[in-house]
Amino acid sequence: MLQNIRIVLVETSHTGNMGSVARAMKTMGLTNLWLVNPLVKPDSQAIALAAGASDVIGNAHIVDTLDEALAGCSLVVGTSARSRTLPWPILDPRECGLKSVAEAANTPVALVFGRERVGLTNEELQKCHYHVAIAANPEYSSLNLAMAVQVIAYEVRMAWLATQENGEQVEHEETPYPLVDDLERFYGHLEQTLLATGFIRENHPGQVMNKLRRLFTRARPESQELNILRGILASIEQQNKGNKAE
């Protein structure tokens, strides 16, 4: 189950942080590290700070885009410390651990951490089903990257340990949610249809697509429901083509 949980770091700029994150992961039983467009490649400093978790560094997946790191996942949770213009469903670390472990029983899950200085962009956060916020001391809330990973990884481990004990079981998510790849294709189809009908204008979509993403993220349609929505869009497209042909 734990091997299905990906720790995804976006554009990390210090190799020491990679090593410290690897150590934080391995102490909690997590080994699946993904590096998205790292500004520096893992080096001897990363290995040194990994302190026995060099295998996590050595086996890390290095990819160019966040989409590559999320491919095949059914649940994506992004870390966010800032209030955003567009609100999003928020989890605390404990809820994040429970939900991640429940879903990782069936499909890969991605826990996404942003850049050391500025975190994740709004566009990256919009690719997430949920955001997770750590309730740190408001007078001094600065957590470094490895600290943030450690907090979330600990809650994941606690949730996983609960599934191993007879007295407490974490309920597994068995509903077939679509993968991130399928959702992105749906959003592309939706935008294409809205452009074709004139509901939004090319190069001037405003906040409509962002708000629709939030709506469907909050609703989190199942795979069959997403197929119905795709069918509705296809029907609208067909009707629109027929009207133009007349």
From Swiss-Prot:
Q: Provide the species name.
A: Escherichia coli O6:K15:H31 (strain 536 / UPEC)
Subcellular localization(s) per the UniProt record: Cytoplasm
**Catalytic function, reaction form:** cytidine(32) in tRNA + S-adenosyl-L-methionine = 2'-O-methylcytidine(32) in tRNA + S-adenosyl-L-homocysteine + H(+); uridine(32) in tRNA + S-adenosyl-L-methionine = 2'-O-methyluridine(32) in tRNA + S-adenosyl-L-homocysteine + H(+)
Question: Family per UniProt?
Answer: Belongs to the class IV-like SAM-binding methyltransferase superfamily. RNA methyltransferase TrmH family.
Q: Name one GO biological process term.
A: tRNA nucleoside ribose methylation
Gene designation per UniProt: trmJ
Q: What is this protein called?
A: tRNA (cytidine/uridine-2'-O-)-methyltransferase TrmJ
Q: Which NCBIfam families match?
A: PRK15114.1 (NF011694), rRNA_methyl_1 (TIGR00050)
Principal localization reads: cytoplasm
Q: Which UniProt keywords apply?
A: Cytoplasm, Methyltransferase, S-adenosyl-L-methionine, Transferase, tRNA processing
Quaternary context: Homodimer.
GO MF annotation terms: RNA binding; tRNA (cytidine(32)/uridine(32)-2'-O)-methyltransferase activity
Please verify whether the record's keywords include Mitochondrion.
Answer: no
Q: Which GO terms describe its cellular component?
A: cytosol
Q: Name one Pfam family in it.
A: SpoU_methylase
Gene3D superfamilies in the record, alphabetically? 1.10.8.590, 3.40.1280.10
User: Would you say which domain of life the source belongs to?
Assistant: Bacteria
